[in-house]
Amino acid sequence: MNPKYKPLFEPFTFKSGVTINNRIAVAPMTHYASNEDGTISEAELDYIIPRSKEMGMVITACANVTPDGKAFPGQPAIHDDSNIPGLKKLAQAIQAQGAKAVVQIHHGGIECPSELVPQQDVVGPSDVFDNGKQIARALTEEEVENIVKAFGEATRRAIEAGFDGVEIHGANGYLIQQFYSPKTNQRTDRWGGSDEKRLAFPLAIVDEVKKAASEHAKGAFLVGYRLSPEEPETPGLTMTETYTLVDALGDKELDYLHISLMDVNSKARRGADPTRTRMDLLNERVGNKVPLIAVGSIHSADDALAVIENGIPLVAMGREILVDPNWTVKVKEGREKQIETVIKGTDKEKYHLPEPLWQAIVNTQGWVPYKD
């Protein structure tokens, strides 16, 4: 190994007591590869195994905690005990490569396509209309409480399946973020109507997940939370609301906050100094309370090292690990110059990508670097 990259390979111990071998994580990525019923497929295992080698931690594709939370075809499910045997295979496949296995738990809310949810009954914090037609309905208070409980039950299943932790998916415009955002939450009950009330749902889920972890986990079990710091729309989340959120999450004894960005160096847009990066601002705000994971357009070993040298303790990669599953192996062996940055259509087999994910990469220009 090139000695300058040693900081990437130092172990890290979370508050919960879970220790990872290095500072590098696989970011959660949708792969469209689970079986239709949400159980884990062989294609999914074939995809995850090479990407787990020499990783500190692997965060899985998001798994829906209720049937009406399914946001993608081929999404893994964690809403029923019948999901546990497949999830156990997934956890073991990751752990056999030496990485800690973390399952991301999720509800898509109004982002769920109607054809994927029972009775095409799409739900969210508030009613949603498109050209006068209702396309999603507001959850009742009882339904909100049941979804909170479902996150706890999903955590129990993750523990029974042998995972080392869960990541609460509070990012990317899905249900948890929908409840916090003034754009999507127009409720006037205890789940909305003010900044404080809009915060109630994310915090209730954190409390429920932490409670399930303390009740069911026999050893160390980590709980992380992923968030998106800003929304482009007005009304929408700005850095001001994000500060309020991370302040509250920072008091919850979480193992980490995973800051979901397309570019780790992107600067604040509203509610904070626009000359500074969101990562710097958030690390300054809560980094002394809870470790942050940085993600977004990190490709080279130098990109990853720059994150660590900037005071962020953990780095995750998504698209780059689709392109080069052996990224960490190469850096560890001093072969960082051999890291690949583009998927070649002529070498399809070597990438171990499930067919639906391969098609998404080929057909979505500008998402993952690709050439025929």
Curated annotation (Swiss-Prot):
InterPro entries: Aldolase_TIM, NADH_flavin_oxidoreductase, OxRdtase_FMN_N. Disulfide bonds: none annotated. Its EC number is 1.-.-.-. Coiled coil: none annotated. It is an enzyme of class 1 (oxidoreductase). Keywords: FAD, Flavoprotein, NAD, Oxidoreductase. It comes from the Bacteria. GO terms for molecular function: FMN binding; oxidoreductase activity. The keyword Flavoprotein applies. Belongs to the NADH:flavin oxidoreductase/NADH oxidase family. This is Probable NADH-dependent flavin oxidoreductase YqiG. The gene is yqiG.
